[in-house]
Each structure stands twice: as structure tokens, then as C-alpha cells.
């Protein structure tokens, strides 16, 4: 009946036990448990295994044709029986990943108030400032080890979604568990409800958030500071992941807190790590080094610049000087190529701007366009976060680069710069591609091209597992670089010349294990974690890796 012989002693019984999603087993409660936990008559007579339950749940799932309906159905299982939820995802991860996260989660965030069923996590409203410590004590889960937090201002490519952004922390933490084996009992999604500037939400009678323009400036900073201090007091060893903060706040918050608490920003650092991992794999498949590439970005926000800085760091590790590495990076935004004579560049953009004297001849009549950059700079890599890749741009790139590396990273799918089928057709099948959203394999000239999804889920679950297992107190740039290196080593295309740039999702547990070990070892090496041998770290990682299995229950007094 039970795959795990461990016994759990519980004081809960009756409806209270059935309503606890972490403990509920539904029809899998044994006759003895039904008797001892006052469940007699509360469940149908059949005693089922989790395998039988999973088969029924999947059969029900298949009756839905609409992705949003599938998302709502899975979220309902998550809120009633988390063990079954993760068993279902484990067995169908490639099919269900796009449903529980991108691209479907984007629509779920937009419709959050309309599809709301029950609360999950914490909603920290600005009117509650001064009481955040007390609110954290209200959390249903007390042993919190990983927090994902958003303020809902920049949700995917969809902009300000207010508290609808809560769908992102919920989805990200589901992937921490499904991909990285983090016990769901140790996770907590949080949204900072500081208002919204989305007029549609403010006028929507169904909107469930605080109806107020967004708090900004010092008031905003003070509210975030109160949250950070409250977490340090309540869960001093928790890992905090910042998620989908607007550009004006994302980098400043990361810089303010990265050396004070164990935290990272997935949009900046996680996206950078998975992108560098994809590039390292592509370079290996093409028989070159990353330091040999010339890289153009379409989009010069915090995410794009974060990726660029990670690439610079890797190029330096391969032997280039800082200036030589930066000379190979071309950042293009809606005004054209970023150059050092432009006004109003943000701090993180200034370091990546090209010297105007070097590129002034590329367009003497105005701003330097993407096509100008491709024609004159002759990039071998094109990355969009987000942007627009036209046929003319891709074909011009292919004219001087036999195997161009093209990464259209925008999500959800509706926002992608160019589809893989177009890119493959425009390059006669020569392009190496990884996308931000999932795409089916492309058939061109009777050959099938699997499309890798450059998804942060390859990175952050392993980072979380490595941080928890090692007891790391910080997330360093070197730990993130290790995760990129390990991901590249897992690439099927780099290993044998066949397959996608990144490993299939069915192998995600193995990938997360490998990344976790590399991250943990680097944390120990940098004295950010207690000294442990590799064997001890492996044992820790295995002990932290939660599996969706039912345990035996014994009743104990309150």
C-alpha cells in the first residue's frame, strides 16, 4: 500500500485532516487510519493506491480541451491533495509544465480574480504596513525554507497584473517541488499588494486586490524593507526569490539585499544562468567557445542586461579582458543600439553601451537599427528579451554565420519574437534555437528539429535544492555560473550532436541533482555554507529531495 515505510504522527482528525492539502490522502486512507482519525463515513468505501488515484485524475484532466480549464483543475488538486498533485505532474511533466506555468500561467494571472477559488500563500497589503511580522505568523506553513515573492508589476510580458501576479509565485514554487524535489511544506508564495496602475483592474468589480495606484519611492522601499526584516526574524535561513518586479525596482532590490540575505532575482539571474547554459551547449555543439561569439540583444532591460553581464563574466573566465568581452555585446532597444553618447541610460545599461566612435559609421543618418547591427557587427548570436526578429534580420545574420544561435526568449508564446519554424526555414535548418516558451518540434526538409525551451525551471529548482542542502547563506554569481556550466554538460546536442540544446523535461530531476551538487560545492568553497565533503553534500541533497508518496499515519494527542 505504501511506497515509503516512514510513519507520521498527527494530532489532526476528521474533516480537519481532509482539508489539509499537505496531509490529505483522500481515498488512500487505510481502514485503520479511517478508524483512528475519525474518517469513517467521510470517504467512499474503496481503498485506493496513489497510482489508482493518479489514473482517475489524469482521466479527468483529459476531458478538458481548454488550457485554462486544465490549469484550474490542476490548481484544485493542488489545493486539496498536494501529494497527488505532484505525482500527477511527475508522470506527465512534459505535458503539464505549459499548463502549470508558462504560457498558461500568464492568462491565469490576468484572470486571477475571476478564477479565484481559495487562498494560497500570503497577500501583504500596503495598508497592513507595520504588521508584517504578525502576518507572517499567520502563514499556514510554519517551516518555510523557500519564498517566492512578487509585487505583480511586470508579470511575464503582460505588465501590471496587481495581485493577479500571485499566480507566478504559486507556479514557480510548484516547479521547485516538481523539478527540484523541494518539500511543498517548506514553500511559501507571497505577493506584495502595493496597488496597481492597471486601470482595467481598478475598474473591474471582480478585482480582489487593493484598489489604489501603486505605491512608489521611499514608501515602497520602506515596505519592502519591512518585509525583508520580518522574514529575517521569522525564517532567518529562508531563500528569497524575487520574481517579476518592474525594471525600476528589480535591479535596485537585488543590489540592496543580495549581500544581506539569501536571495536572488530569477528574471535577472535565473534567466541569465539558463541562457548562458544554453549558449555554452550551443557553442560546444558548434565546436567553438562563448568568447568567440558576437552577441546581439533585442531588449536592453534588466533581464537582457543581466544575461549580458553573465555572458561577460563567462567570456572573462575563458580568457578575455573585461573590455574585450563587452566589445562583443550589442544591446539594441526601441531607440536602436545603445551607445555611450546616449542620454538617460540606466546604470546597468551604461556598462554595456558600445563606444559611439566605433559604430558611428553603421548609420550616419540616425539611430543604429537592429538590421544595421546585424549587417555591420556580424553577430553570431541573437537573443530577444523581448524584441522582434524579422526575416530580413535572420537571413542577414545567416549570410555571415553558418550556424547562427537564435534565442527568442519572450513569453508567453503570443509574445515570441519569431517562431522556431520561421527561423529554421529562413536559415535552411542551420540555426541553433532555444525559446522562452514551449514549441513543438519543427519538420523541415523531412528532418525533425526538437526545440529546446530555455526555461528557468532548468536552473532555479537545482539552485534551491543546493542552497537548502548545503545550508548556504547567500546566492553568489559563482554559484549561478556553476549552474550554467552543469546545464551545458547535460545538453543532448552538445553530448552527441543530436537532439535539442537542452535536456528533455523528463530528465529534470537528474539535471536538478547535478546543479544542486555543483551549487552546494561552490557554496562550501566560498565559505557561504558549513564545510562538508562531496559525499556529505550528496547525502544532504538526497535527504532533502521530496517524493510524492503517501506515508503511514499514527494518531497522537494535541
Curated annotation (Swiss-Prot):
The keyword DNA damage does not apply. The record marks 267 as: Important for activity. Its EC number is 1.1.1.38. It is an enzyme of class 1 (oxidoreductase). It catalyses: (S)-malate + NAD(+) = pyruvate + CO2 + NADH; oxaloacetate + H(+) = pyruvate + CO2. The active site is at residues 101, 172. GO terms for molecular function: malate dehydrogenase (decarboxylating) (NAD+) activity; metal ion binding; NAD binding; oxaloacetate decarboxylase activity. It comes from the Bacteria. Keywords: Metal-binding, NAD, Oxidoreductase. Divalent metal cations. Prefers magnesium or manganese. Its cofactor is Mg(2+); Mn(2+). PROSITE patterns: MALIC_ENZYMES. NAD(+) binds at residues 154, 267, 411. One of its GO terms (biological process) is malate metabolic process. A divalent metal cation binds at residues 243-244, 267. Pfam families: malic (PF00390), Malic_M (PF03949). Belongs to the malic enzymes family. This is NAD-dependent malic enzyme 2. It comes from Photobacterium profundum (strain SS9). The lineage of its organism: Bacteria, Pseudomonadati, Pseudomonadota, Gammaproteobacteria, Vibrionales. The gene is maeA2.
